[in-house]
Amino acid sequence: MFATSRPGLLHPLHAILLAFPIALFTGALASDIAYLNTAEMQWSNFAAWMITFALVVGGPVLLWSLMLLLRRRNRGPARLYVACFAVAWVLGLVNAFQHSRDAWASVGVAGLILSLASTGLVLAAGWIAFSATVDREMVR
C-alpha cells in the first residue's frame, strides 16, 4: 500500500483565511434577500458589515494568492483561482460602496446583482482552491 499526494494549491493558513470571504459574501447575499423580503433595514446593515469584513480579510488572501501565482510553475488552476477571487473582491468593493448608501436604496437590483456575482465568484474560487489537492491511495 502506498499513498501519493500532489501538493495542494493553498497553504493551510491561506485556506482558513479564504473561508471567511466565502462565508461572509454568502451571508451578505442571504441578508440582501432577507432585506428584499422584509424591508427591515437592519438586514441591509448586516450585509454591509459582512461585505466590509469579507474585504478586510480578503485583501491579505488576494495578496497571498498573487504571490502564489508568481511562485507556481503549473499556473493553470492558480491563475483561474486568482482571477475569480480578484474579480469577486473588486465586485465586493463596488458592492460595499453600493451598500453604504441609504438603506432604502442600497440593496435593490444593483446590490443584489453585485452580491450574487461576488458570492458566485468567491464560491468558484474556493471550489478551485480546495479541489486542487489530489490524494490517491493504492492497495496491493
Predicted features, each with a name:
Residues 93-111:
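Membrane-helix boundary connector in multi-pass membrane proteins
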Residues 6, 34-47, 102-107, 139-140:
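Membrane-interface interhelical loops and short amphipathic "cap" helices
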Residues 10-18, 35-57, 77-81:
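Transmembrane alpha-helix entry/boundary detector in multi-pass membrane proteins
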Residues 105-134:
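Alpha-helical membrane-associated segments of multi-pass integral membrane proteins
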Residues 22-31, 48-69, 83-93:
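Core segments of alpha-helical transmembrane spans in multipass integral membrane proteins
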